[in-house]
Design a protein with these regions (language model features):
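Alpha-to-beta junction loops
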Residues: 62-63, 79-88, 130-132, 163, ...
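Bacterial N-terminal signal peptides
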Residues: 5-16
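Ligand-binding cleft/hinge of the Venus flytrap
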Residues: 39, 53-61, 141-160, 190-191, ...
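Extended ligand-binding regions for polar small-molecule ligands
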Residues: 50-59, 117-132, 137-140, 209-245
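Extracytoplasmic small-molecule ligand-binding "clamshell" domains
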Residues: 21-89, 98, 159-160, 234
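Acidic, polar ligand-binding/catalytic clefts
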Residues: 58, 63-127, 194-202
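Short, well-ordered beta-strand segments
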Residues: 26-30, 132-135, 179, 210
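Periplasmic-binding protein-like
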Residues: 31, 108-117, 184-227, 244-245
Length: 245
């Protein structure tokens, strides 16, 4: 009887270990934030963060899949356990850090204004004139802009969009005067559309991977994974492929 009991215990533990190994971590991504995260023309999640996390998952021995999530609701989805992490160009902010745990920063970005290629506007005029500035809703740069606008008394109006590329389209269609966003999607637009980066605003931002606060062991894997990735030649390949820097 004792042998049977021990056999069942071993079987149970083995099953638990197999279940843990089979777990697929769900990464919530912004479906329209090139070049860090987006869904390509074939419907496949792509981008710098997607490729980086795929490499880390393989190296650290876990499985991952990438699922587009509305950016405004991405942290609530993480807390509700509908996704397991956010590796999608998320800026580390004190407000977000109250709700989630962040990895060590893996990238820095600045914020920029984008205008039509033939626009005569200057940065000074953006702050001084009653223009319309398009920004992605739920982003740290949009919050910074709204807060500073109230403090400084800037005359422009902020119009919010579901994504930065949507703001670019309205810029080209003449519905807004300026788009404001992180540098990477602005540079992506500048390469593909008749627009130009006009100048910078706000503060330099740091990107990190967000997980639930109780998932510290998983967070350690992410941090170790990025440490290994940055020491591997593949890191420079990713930068060359996606960021062109």
């Amino acid at each position: 009887m004792q042998r049977i009991v021990w056999f069942l215990v071993v079987l149970f533990l083995a099953a638990g270990a197999a279940h843990a190994a089979d777990k697929v971590y769900v990464n919530g991504i912004d479906a329209n934030y090139p070049p860090f995260a987006y869904v390509d023309k074939t419907g496949k999640p792509s981008g710098f963060d997607v490729d980086a996390l795929d490499w880390i998952a393989k190296k650290m021995g876990f499985q991952v899949k990438h699922v587009p999530v509305d950016w405004d609701g991405i942290i609530p989805n993480l807390l509700a356990k509908k996704i397991d992490l956010i590796c999608s160009g998320m800026t580390i902010t004190p407000e977000r850090a109250e709700k989630v745990a962040f990895s060590k920063p893996y990238w820095e970005v600045k914020n920029v204004f984008v205008v039509k290629k033939d626009s005569p506007l200057t940065v000074e005029e953006i702050y001084a004139k009653p223009l319309t500035v398009g920004m992605q809703a739920g982003t740290s740069e949009a919050k910074w802009m709204a807060d500073e606008k109230a403090k400084q008394g800037w005359k422009f109006t902020i119009k919010l969009y579901d994504s930065s590329p949507m703001a670019i389209e309205d810029l080209l269609n003449g519905r807004i005067d300026v788009a404001a966003m992180n540098y990477p999607p602005a540079r992506d637009a500048e390469r593909k559309k008749p627009v130009k980066i006009l100048g910078t605003f706000g503060e330099v931002e740091e990107f990190g991977v967000a997980v639930r606060k109780e998932d510290q062991e998983f967070l350690e894997k992410i941090n170790k994974g990025f440490e290994l990735l940055k020491a591997d030649p593949y890191w420079e390949e990713l930068i060359s492929k996606h960021l062109n820097q």
